[in-house]
C-alpha cells in the first residue's frame, strides 16, 4: 500500500513539473523573440532624432537654414555647456558670449562702417556744421574712394580721431540725439532699410537664443561705445544692456574743467559733461582681449567675429576652452560680399581653429525679405548731395 502511494505521488510530481517546465520554456521562447519585434522601431527612433535636430534649428535659431552646419554646431555646443551632467558644463554666472558688431551683428558696407558713415555725414552733408577745409577734403576723398571701391586715402589721423574732434563740445545727450537722427537715414546701397535697421536678423535671433540659455551677452567692437549703445538699443537692448557694451573710448571733460587734470578737479552740480575731442583707446585686435579682461573679468564661453580684428578675441576664447565662430562675407546677392576674400578668410580661420558661418548658405535672409540690394557700384552726383 505504501509502495503504491509513493508511486502515485511521484507520478503526480512529474506531471506537475512537466507542465511548469513547458510553461517556463514557452515564456522563455516568447521573451527571446521580443527583440525581433522591436528592431524596426529602433530605426524609427534614429530618424526622429535627426528630425528633432532640424526642428531645434528652426525653433531656436530663426532665419537660419535648417541644414546649417554652423547652427547645428552652435546648438550642440550650447547644449553641452548648459547640461549639468556634461563635462563641458559652464555655470550660469560664468556663461558669457562676446560679439563683434560690424560685419558680425550689423552690416559694414553702407558703404562702410556705421561710425565712418556718421563722420562723413557730419563733414559733408550736415548743413548745420562747417568743417575745416582739411577735414572737408579728407572726407570727400574718403567718400569718393568708398563709392568707387578704391583704397581709403592716407591721413595723419584715424577716422576715429577725426570723429572725436568733430563732436567736441557735445553733451552725451546731444551726441546720442545726433546719432539717432542719422540712424533714420536710408542705408546706402539698399532699399527698404534705414541705418538703424541694418542688423543681421539671423544673428539677432542667435543673441536671443543664447540669452534664453542663460548666457550673459556682451558686444566688443572697435566702434566708439556711445555710438554702439545708441545704435544697438532698439534692436538688441532687450538682451544686451549698456553696461555690457565695450567699444573705443572718446575723452570727456566737465564743463568747468578747462584742461585741469581730472585727478585734481571736482565738478559742481550744474556742470555738464562734454566730449573733449580725443580718441583715448581703439578697441581692436589685442585691445579687445584687454578690454574683456579689464571691464568684465570674464573668460568668453563663446565668441563671434568676422575679421582679423577679432582673431585675438577668438583665440582668447579658445584658449579658455570656449568656441569661436567667424562670419564669411560670401553673399553677393543679398549683400556686398567678396567671394575671394571670404575663401581666403575661411582658410585662415581653419588654421586658427575657428568655425565659420556662411552668410550665403547658413542664413535664410540677412536684413529681411522686404530689404533689397540696389546693385549700386557707384553713385551719381544727385545721390552724393542727398
Region annotations inferred by a language model:
Residues 2-24:
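Sec-dependent N-terminal signal peptides of Gram-positive bacterial secreted proteins and lipoproteins
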Residues 7, 89-91, 238:
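Generic structural signal for beta-strand residues in well-ordered domains
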Residues 12, 21-30, 37-101, 109-110, ...:
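Non-catalytic pre-domain segments flanking phosphatase-related domains
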Residues 53-65, 79, 94, 177-218, ...:
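C-terminal cap/substrate-recognition subdomain and adjoining C-terminal extension
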Residues 68, 169, 286:
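Electropositive phosphate-/nucleotide-binding environments in soluble metabolic enzymes
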Residues 110-113, 117-197, 201, 205:
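A metal-dependent, Asp-based hydrolase signature
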Amino acid at each position: 500500500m505504501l509502495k503504491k502511494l509513493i508511486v502515485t505521488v511521484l507520478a503526480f510530481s512529474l506531471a506537475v513539473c512537466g507542465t511548469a517546465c513547458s510553461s517556463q520554456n514557452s515564456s522563455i521562447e516568447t521573451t527571446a523573440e521580443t527583440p525581433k519585434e522591436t528592431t524596426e522601431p529602433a530605426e524609427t527612433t534614429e530618424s526622429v532624432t535627426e528630425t528633432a535636430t532640424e526642428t531645434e534649428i528652426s525653433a531656436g535659431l530663426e532665419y537660419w537654414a535648417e541644414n546649417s552646419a554652423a547652427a547645428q554646431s552652435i546648438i550642440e555646443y550650447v547644449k553641452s555647456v548648459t547640461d549639468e551632467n556634461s563635462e563641458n558644463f559652464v555655470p550660469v554666472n560664468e556663461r558669457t558670449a562676446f560679439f563683434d558688431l560690424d560685419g558680425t551683428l550689423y552690416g559694414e558696407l553702407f558703404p562702410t562702417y556705421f561710425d565712418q558713415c556718421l563722420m562723413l555725414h557730419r563733414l559733408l552733408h550736415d548743413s548745420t556744421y562747417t568743417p575745416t577745409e582739411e577735414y572737408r577734403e579728407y572726407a570727400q576723398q574718403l567718400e569718393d574712394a568708398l563709392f568707387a571701391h578704391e583704397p581709403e586715402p592716407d591721413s595723419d589721423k584715424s577716422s576715429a580721431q577725426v570723429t572725436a574732434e568733430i563732436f567736441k563740445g557735445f553733451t552725451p545727450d546731444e551726441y546720442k540725439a545726433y546719432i539717432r537722427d542719422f540712424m533714420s537715414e536710408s542705408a546706402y546701397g539698399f532699399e527698404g532699410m534705414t541705418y538703424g535697421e541694418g542688423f543681421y536678423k539671423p544673428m539677432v535671433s542667435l543673441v536671443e537664443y543664447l540669452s534664453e540659455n542663460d548666457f550673459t551677452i556682451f558686444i566688443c567692437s572697435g566702434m566708439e561705445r556711445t555710438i554702439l549703445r545708441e545704435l544697438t538699443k532698439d534692436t538688441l537692448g532687450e538682451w544686451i544692456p549698456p553696461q555690457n557694451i565695450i567699444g573705443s573710448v572718446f575723452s570727456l571733460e566737465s564743463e568747468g574743467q578747462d584742461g585741469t587734470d581730472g585727478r585734481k578737479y571736482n565738478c559742481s552740480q550744474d556742470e555738464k559733461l562734454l566730449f573733449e575731442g580725443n580718441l583715448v583707446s581703439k578697441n581692436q585686435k589685442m585691445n579687445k582681449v584687454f578690454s574683456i579682461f579689464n571691464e568684465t573679468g570674464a573668460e568668453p564661453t563663446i565668441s563671434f567675429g568676422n575679421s582679423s580684428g577679432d582673431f585675438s578675441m577668438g583665440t582668447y576664447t579658445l584658449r579658455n576652452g570656449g568656441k569661436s565662430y567667424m562670419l564669411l562675407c560670401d553673399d553677393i546677392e543679398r549683400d556686398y560680399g567678396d567671394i575671394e576674400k571670404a575663401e581666403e578668410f575661411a582658410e585662415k580661420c581653419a588654421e586658427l581653429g575657428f568655425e565659420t558661418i556662411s552668410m550665403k548658405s547658413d542664413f535664410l535672409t540677412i536684413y529681411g525679405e522686404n530689404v533689397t540690394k540696389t546693385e549700386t557700384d557707384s553713385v551719381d552726383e544727385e545721390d552724393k548731395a542727398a
